[in-house]
Amino acid sequence: MVKYEDFLAGKQHIPPSCGFEVDKPAMNIHMFEWQKDITRWALRKGRAALFEECGNGKTIQQLEFADQVAKREGRPVLIVAPLTVGAQTLREAQKFGYSAAICRTQADVTPGINITNYEMLQHFDGRSFAGVVLDESSILKNYTGKMRNQIIEMFKDTPYRLSCTATPSPNDYMELGNQVEFLGIMSRTEMLATYFIHDGSDTSKWRLKGHAEDRFWEWVSTWAVVLTCPGDLGYPNDGYILPPLNMTEHIVEVESGDKYSLFGGEIAKTLTERRDARRASLRERCEQAAEIIAQNPDEQWVCWCDLNAESELLTECIPNSEEVRGSDKPEAKEDALIRFANGYLSVLVTKPSIAGFGMNWQQCHNMIFVGLSDSYEQMYQAIRRCYRFGQKRPVNVHIVTSAAEGDVKANVERKEQQAAEMKQNMVQYTKEILRKDIRGQERIVIPYDPQIAMIVPDWVISE
């Protein structure tokens, strides 16, 4: 009979190391020293995550990772990016001297670096790639979604994997679980069972076990680098000091007799009620946004909205504005976003779900949120399109809401504080990562060491 200890030992799985060393002189000359160190660490690991504040140069790091893997293995590497970001990644590749191509199907794949978007993944064979890079990988946060399952299954045998995104959402441990499962380090279920306690019946309510918090963040630091600025790793912060962020809330009143109006006096509580309140104040909010922009008509503005009706009315109210909708053809979206990035479009009206991830708009320093969803991450990402390293001017963020929506600004600031605390915890342990020489990645399985002998009932013992 197999001993129980041997049985448990047999359940442990340590995948083979797939990382390799790269000398700094062999890396792209346009990279900063700290970018080289992080990328070398990721290549040694083979499978890693880069959670970096916007503007730290994740693009050149992921391009270097992909290029080094492709050269070493002699096989193509795939970079997967949001629909509106792929063309920008290609331009960055060309600027830094990488050979890369945009691909829509497997037939388009060329040796070296290939770039596609998440919507095209079903047209590719994951087994043909030596490595995969997920850009803006927070798309995995939809942990019950088809996309998450497709990505994890498609690349489960891919030797080299890199996940790149901004720092995770506040207390969104499910997102970390998805990241670690994509990397093949530990399943999300194992992570939750090891480090977390489930609160109540809501499947999303997980909290860290008190005694496991330090161990959890130490474990995260074995596969993820978390960076708010180069100074987190002891490098100079020259050029990486952000200008002021000015956030102003504008509260409009609705005098329509609606239950969410000035005379109705109710505060929306549920998601449905908040959406109803936004519809009730639609015209007032859009007109307020137009008035704000009219005060500085010669500067560029981004108008973020949540509803199609908001997008349509904003375009009507604001001169020289252009709307980018989800139903637009990919080429039309790309054209409008590039024109805005190059300064040829004065006012862009769109949703965070369309253009809130990955775009670099440091040339613009004014934005308005005319409609907000309940996603903190979407707002965080949308603000970071302009408020990122490389921005030279103070960034002005205007939030236009109705009185029925409550104190939106205070809620945003509360979540921002939560995010800052989470980043600080992760950075605290990540600081030492680059001083270690760790190769590959081990699948973490916590050994079970029973202190009390198991009593087996007589009726389950075979004669």
Predicted regions and their residues:
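Walker A/P-loop
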Residues: K45-F65
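Conserved pre-motif I regulatory segment
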Residues: H13-F51
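A short beta-strand element within the Helicase C-terminal
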Residues: S128-V133, E175-N178, M359-L372, V395-I399
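Conserved interdomain hinge at the start of the Helicase C-terminal
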Residues: E273, R278-D306
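Conserved Walker A/P-loop ATP-binding site and its immediately adjacent core
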Residues: T59-E64, E73-K95, P170-E175, L307-N308
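Conserved helicase ATPase core of P-loop NTP-dependent helicases/translocases
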Residues: V302-W304, E312-L313, P319-A355
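A conserved SF2-helicase RecA2
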Residues: D374-S462
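Conserved P-loop NTPase motor "coupling/switch" region that bridges the ATPase
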Residues: G74-P76, K95, G131, I139, ...
